[in-house]
C-alpha cells in the first residue's frame, strides 16, 4: 500500500472572477492540514492539453501555506486562467489524462463555469474512478449557473457592487455634462449582472435578453426602446441619462442583426464555440444609430463597456467568506468519495451536487439560469425605469408631450413606438 501523500491538483478555467484566490486558499489550506501535496496548474488546461510532461512541470507550482495564507483578500488568481478546451478532441483529453497520471494527481479540483466543469468531467470519464476524483467549484460573475435556492455564483456580488459604483459615477457625469451613456455590461446569456448594477445604481433604463418575447431580437427594436426612453426624459426637460445593456442581447439577436453588428461577416467564436460578444460593439453600434436619429435634438451619446474591470476586483466580504467555504467543501467532498460533482451552498450548507443533475438534456450542457421576469425583483427594477409603458401610450397628454420633444406628431410617435410594448414583457 502506497504511503505517498495524495496529490491535489487545482486549476482555474474561463474568465477571472472575484474570489478565485479564496477557493484556491480554502482548498489548499485544508488539504495541507490533511497531509496532502497541493499543486496548481498554470493557465487552466492550456499546458495539460499539450501532453508534454516537462512543459506541464514547468508551468506547475507547489501551493504551500506561505503562498496561499493571505490570498483570499486578493482579486485575480495566482495560478492564472485560460479558455483552453480539451473537449475539442479525444487526443487533447488523453493528453490531459497522461499528464495527470504522470504527476500522480489523485484529486482534481477545477474552478470555473460550465465549460471548465464539462472539460474536467470529460477527462475523468476516461480514467478509473479509483484513479482520480474530480470536483468543480462553479464560478462566473454572470450568475447564470443553476445553483439551488437562488444562490448566487461567487464573484457576482463583488462585480455588481463595483459596477454599481461605476454607473453611479456615470449618472453624475451624465447630468453634469449632459449626455446619455449606453453601458454594455457582461453577461453571455443572462441579464443578472446588468440588471443588478442598473437597479442598484438607479440607471434610467436596462435591457436584458430575457424580457424580449420572441426567440430572436431585432437590432431595430433595441434601438427604438432606447430612443423612446430618451425622448420621454427629454419631454421632462432631462437631456441626459444612463442605459444599461446586457451584452447577452447579442446572443439572442437574429442572423440579420448579427451580420449588422459584425460587419456582414460570421460572428467570431471562442474555443468553446461561444460568440465573442465583446467584438459586437453593441453599445457603440446603438450609439451611432441613435445619434443619426437624435443628433438634431442636441442629444449627446457616449458608449461605455463595463466588464473586464469587474473580473479581478478584490472580493467583498460576502465572496471572501463564500469562496473559502467552497474550497473547504471541495476537499470535504473528496474525503467522502464524491466525484463529477459541483460544490454548492444551499440553506447555509456547502454540499456536492452531481454534475449530470445540472445538465440540459437537449444540449448536454449545464442549464443556464435566466432572470425570472415574472419575479417581484424584476418588477421592482422595471417600475423605476423611464421606459414607455402601455399605460403611457394610453395617456394622450403624455404621448403629445413626448412626441413634441422628438419633433413628431402624436400619431407618428405612436405608430413608430407603441408596438414595442408587444416586443418586451410589461
From Swiss-Prot:
Substrate binds at residues 140-142, 186-188, 247, 308-311. Its cofactor is Mg(2+). Diphosphate binds at residue 15. Mg(2+) binds at residue 114. GO terms for cellular component: cytoplasm. Its EC number is 2.7.1.90. Pfam families: PFK (PF00365). Non-allosteric. Pathway: Carbohydrate degradation; glycolysis; D-glyceraldehyde 3-phosphate and glycerone phosphate from D-glucose: step 3/4. One of its GO terms (molecular function) is 6-phosphofructokinase activity. Its main location: cytoplasm. The record marks 115 as: Important for catalytic activity and substrate specificity. It catalyses: beta-D-fructose 6-phosphate + diphosphate = beta-D-fructose 1,6-bisphosphate + phosphate + H(+). It is found in: Cytoplasm. Keywords: Cytoplasm, Glycolysis, Kinase, Magnesium, Metal-binding, Transferase. GO terms for biological process: fructose 6-phosphate metabolic process; response to glucose. InterPro entries: ATP_PFK, Phosphofructokinase_dom, PKF_sf, PPi-PFK_TM0289. The record marks 139 as: Important for catalytic activity. Belongs to the phosphofructokinase type A (PFKA) family. PPi-dependent PFK group II subfamily. Clade 'Short' sub-subfamily. Catalyzes the phosphorylation of D-fructose 6-phosphate, the first committing step of glycolysis. Uses inorganic phosphate (PPi) as phosphoryl donor instead of ATP like common ATP-dependent phosphofructokinases (ATP-PFKs), which renders the reaction reversible, and can thus function both in glycolysis and gluconeogenesis. Consistently, PPi-PFK can replace the enzymes of both the forward (ATP-PFK) and reverse (fructose-bisphosphatase (FBPase)) reactions. Homotetramer. This is Pyrophosphate--fructose 6-phosphate 1-phosphotransferase 2. The gene is pfk2.
Amino acid at each position: 500500500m502506497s504511503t505517498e501523500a495524495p496529490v491535489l491538483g487545482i486549476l482555474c478555467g474561463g474568465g477571472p472572477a472575484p474570489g478565485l484566490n479564496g477557493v484556491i486558499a480554502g482548498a489548499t489550506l485544508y488539504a495541507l492540514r490533511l497531509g496532502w501535496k497541493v499543486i496548481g496548474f498554470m493557465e487552466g488546461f492550456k499546458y495539460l492539453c499539450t501532453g508534454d510532461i516537462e512543459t506541464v512541470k514547468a508551468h506547475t507550482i507547489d501551493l504551500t501555506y506561505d503562498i496561499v495564507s493571505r490570498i483570499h483578500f486578493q482579486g485575480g488568481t495566482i495560478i492564472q486562467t485560460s479558455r483552453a478546451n480539451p473537449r475539442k478532441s479525444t487526443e487533447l483529453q488523453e493528453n490531459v489524462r497522461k499528464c495527470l497520471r504522470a504527476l500522480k494527481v489523485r484529486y482534481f479540483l477545477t474552478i470555473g463555469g460550465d465549460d471548465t466543469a464539462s472539460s474536467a468531467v470529460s477527462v475523468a470519464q476516461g480514467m478509473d474512478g479509483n484513479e482520480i476524483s474530480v470536483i468543480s467549484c462553479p464560478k462566473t460573475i454572470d450568475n447564470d449557473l443553476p445553483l439551488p435556492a437562488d444562490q448566487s455564483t461567487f464573484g457576482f456580488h463583488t462585480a455588481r457592487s463595483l459596477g454599481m459604483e461605476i454607473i453611479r459615477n456615470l449618472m453624475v457625469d451624465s447630468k453634469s455634462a449632459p449626455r446619455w451613456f449606453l453601458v454594455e455590461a457582461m453577461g453571455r446569456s443572462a441579464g443578472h449582472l446588468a440588471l443588478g448594477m442598473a437597479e442598484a445604481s438607479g440607471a434610467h433604463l436596462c435591457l436584458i435578453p430575457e424580457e424580449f418575447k420572441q426567440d430572436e431580437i431585432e437590432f431595430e427594436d433595441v434601438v427604438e426602446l432606447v430612443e423612446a426612453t430618451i425622448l420621454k426624459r427629454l419631454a421632462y426637460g432631462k437631456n441626459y441619462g444612463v442605459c444599461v445593456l446586457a451584452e447577452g442581447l447579442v446572443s439572442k439577436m437574429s442572423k440579420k442583426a448579427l451580420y449588422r453588428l459584425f460587419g456582414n461577416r460570421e460572428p467570431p467564436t471562442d474555443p468553446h464555440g461561444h460568440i465573442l460578444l465583446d467584438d459586437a460593439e453593441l453599445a457603440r453600434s446603438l450609439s451611432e444609430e441613435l445619434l443619426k436619429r437624435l443628433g438634431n435634438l442636441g442629444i449627446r451619446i457616449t458608449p461605455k463597456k463595463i466588464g473586464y474591470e469587474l473580473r479581478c476586483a478584490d472580493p467583498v466580504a460576502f465572496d471572501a467568506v463564500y469562496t473559502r467555504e467552497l474550497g473547504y467543501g471541495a476537499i470535504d467532498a473528496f474525503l467522502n468519495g464524491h466525484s463529477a460533482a459541483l460544490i454548492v451552498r444551499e440553506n447555509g450548507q456547502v454540499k456536492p451536487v452531481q454534475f449530470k443533475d445540472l445538465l440540459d438534456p437537449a444540449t448536454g450542457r449545464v442549464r443556464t439560469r435566466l432572470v425570472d421576469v415574472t419575479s417581484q425583483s424584476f418588477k421592482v427594477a422595471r417600475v423605476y425605469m423611464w421606459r414607455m409603458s402601455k399605460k403611457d401610450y394610453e395617456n394622450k397628454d403624455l404621448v403629445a408631450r413626448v412626441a413634441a420633444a422628438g419633433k413628431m406628431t402624436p400619431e407618428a410617435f405612436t405608430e413608430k413606438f407603441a408596438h414595442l410594448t408587444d416586443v418586451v414583457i410589461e
